[in-house]
């Protein structure tokens, strides 16, 4: 009985505390080149943080919009201009836009704009990169 109560309390803490706070990712120097990425898991939520050619750093849910497969499995690395889903090869630019979706060209109602990666809020403070899954969280600064 105690274990069940502890598990329930922990699940509530995850929802009420950890899903609503800022999470440290690393220093902006870890994103030296376009295509550099870091994967940060917050319990069951996986986030991929990327550096785009424009120099900006973005955060996305690490989930393909096609079938929900995890996009990036390595903790960190570098890609050549896009994130590619290993399941059906949907490709996303480093700014989250869907660039390629094989075998969708014959679908009249399919729009790449409707299938961009879902953003995760990211802020950089004094060179340190933070993410939050709460769109209403107070600014990190």
Would you name each region that the model predicts?
Residues 2-47:
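Non-catalytic accessory segments flanking enzyme active sites
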Residues 31-135:
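Rieske [2Fe-2S] iron-sulfur-binding domain
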């Amino acid at each position: 009985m105690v274990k069940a109560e502890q598990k329930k309390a922990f699940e509530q803490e995850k929802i009420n505390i950890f899903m609503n706070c800022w999470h440290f990712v690393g220093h902006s120097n870890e994103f030296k080149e376009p295509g550099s990425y870091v994967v940060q898991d917050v319990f069951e939520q996986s986030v991929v943080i990327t550096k785009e050619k424009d120099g900006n750093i973005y955060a996305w849910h690490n989930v393909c919009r096609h079938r929900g497969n995890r996009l990036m499995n390595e903790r960190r690395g570098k890609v050549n201009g896009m994130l590619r889903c290993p399941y059906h090869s949907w490709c996303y630019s480093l700014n989250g836009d869907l660039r390629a979706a094989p075998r969708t060209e014959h679908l009249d109602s399919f729009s790449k704009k409707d299938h961009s990666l879902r953003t995760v809020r990211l802020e950089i403070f004094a060179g340190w990169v933070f993410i939050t899954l709460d769109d209403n969280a107070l600014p990190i600064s």
